Swiss-Prot record:
The active site is at 238, 334, 355. GO terms for biological process: proteolysis; symbiont-mediated suppression of host chemokine signal transduction pathway. Prematurely activated/folded staphopain A is inhibited by staphostatin A (ScpB), which is probably required to protect staphylococcal cytoplasmic proteins from degradation by ScpA. Belongs to the peptidase C47 family. GO terms for molecular function: cysteine-type peptidase activity. Cysteine protease that plays an important role in the inhibition of host innate immune response. Cleaves host elastins found in connective tissues, pulmonary surfactant protein A in the lungs, and the chemokine receptor CXCR2 on leukocytes. Proteolytic cleavage of surfactant protein A impairs bacterial phagocytosis by neutrophils while CXCR2 degradation blocks neutrophil activation and chemotaxis. Additionally, promotes vascular leakage by activating the plasma kallikerin/kinin system, resulting in hypotension. It comes from Staphylococcus aureus (strain NCTC 8325 / PS 47). Its main location: secreted. This is Staphopain A. Its EC number is 3.4.22.48. The record marks 214-215 as: Cleavage. The gene is sspP.
Length: 388
């Protein structure tokens, strides 16, 4: 719908992995340094609040298992690597703590993101929020035995290698703000060498844990036919992507596409006016009605039980979010899709969400209405449209 002010974040990484599988933390400690090297992330300091570390260690396996079951993966064993931070170009942390989730081959499968609660907007009573998604996990695994830097701007995330060439590795559909400079300089090595400490993100911090018990005990409920068929590019069609994937799921078809949805609703728009147009809730409801559905607007976040019942009855839910950081720009408002819900083995209730920007799903605390997304922003879930 609406777009966001671009931000720049710098993250420097050094990659070197052995092909030897990791059995557990103890066996890893016996591997000599010359035989085993790890992905290292440059950070200003390695300090992590005790509450943050405890939350990650206590809950990561439950959240990861919920996504494994959504993806129909087999039971597996995981552990956490050392946490790292992401910095803006002024070398200030973005405020989040990132914990890589390692499989027994030493690769990163997921990223646990722990964020301070945004008091003004969040309905959660906890001090921190935890979310799990694939995020940059695949990217981190692609640069073994290389020293790289990861940067982000309005177009997405870049890897800068030792030859100073930048490659776009993860797109985020964001536009340059007209008030900003047309060109953005990539920081030289001096900008990141001031980050003196290194977090070995692929070094296990504890023994690997099997999710066998967790897997068996968890309750998972998903729109049976929900698939990610396309992702949002440089446009304002988040509502189009959301509705097309929900309708594809509930009708068990592949016929809906975001561009066709937007063209149906805005047949007379051309060029950039069409490319960057968004949809109102009324237009979203109208489109659902034209497709044989009876969508209803709910002026709040759906509860866990509502998601559970609607999903069981094959009724899709669209999330309507308002960006916390800024109410201006192309993505000041954003639509996402509810994939399903899960009750973790510890009793925690979560909602599984798909952001049209992403190639994977993410977990969301069912009692927290502020959703962190893959470009570092947060969206307050203020309304829902259900019944697709």
């Amino acid at each position: 719908m609406k777009r966001n002010f671009p931000k720049l974040i710098a993250l420097s990484l050094i990659f070197s992995l052995s092909v030897t599988p990791i059995a557990n933390a103890e066996s890893n400690s016996n591997i000599k340094a010359k035989d085993k090297k790890h992905v290292q992330v440059n950070v200003e300091d390695k300090s992590v609040p005790t509450d943050v570390r405890n939350l990650a260690q206590k809950d990561y396996l439950s959240y990861v298992t919920s996504l494994d079951k959504i993806y129909n993966k087999e039971k597996a064993s995981y552990t956490l690597g050392e946490p790292f931070k992401i910095y803006k170009f002024n070398k200030k942390s973005d405020g989040n703590y990132y914990f890589p989730v390692l499989n027994t081959e030493g690769n990163i499968d997921y990223i646990v993101t722990i964020s301070p609660k945004i008091t003004k907007y969040s309905s959660s009573s906890s001090k921190y929020t935890i979310n799990v998604s694939p995020f940059l996990s695949k990217v981190l695994n692609q640069y073994k035995d290389q020293q790289i830097t990861i940067l982000t701007n309005s177009k997405g995330y870049y890897v800068v290698t030792q030859n100073h060439k930048a490659k776009l590795v993860l797109k985020t559909p964001r536009l340059e703000d007209k008030k900003l400079k047309k060109t953005e300089s990539i920081p030289t090595g001096n900008n990141v060498t001031q980050l003196k400490q290194k977090a070995s993100v692929t070094m296990p911090t504890s023994q690997f844990k099997s999710n066998n018990y967790t897997y068996n005990e968890q309750y998972i409920n998903k729109l049976e036919n929900f698939k990610i068929r396309e992702t949002q590019g440089n446009n304002g069609w988040c509502a189009g992507y959301t509705m097309s994937e929900l309708l594809n799921a509930t009708y068990n078809t592949n016929k809906y596409h975001a561009e066709a949805v937007m063209r149906f609703l805005h047949p007379n728009l051309q060029g950039q006016r069409f490319q960057f147009t968004g949809l109102t809730p009324r237009e979203m409801i109208y489109f659902g009605q034209t497709q044989g559905r009876s969508p209803q607007l709910l002026n709040r976040m759906t509860t866990y039980n509502e998601v559970d019942n609607l999903t069981k009855n094959n009724k899709g839910i669209a999330v309507l979010g308002s960006r916390v950081e800024s109410r201006n720009g192309m993505h000041a408002g954003h639509a996402m899709a509810v994939v399903g819900n899960a009750k973790l083995d510890n009793g925690q209730e979560v909602i599984i969400i798909w952001n049209p920007w992403d190639n994977g799903f993410m977990t969301q605390d069912a009692k927290n209405n502020v959703i962190p997304v893959s470009n570092g922003d947060h969206y307050r879930w203020y309304s829902s449209i259900y019944g697709y």
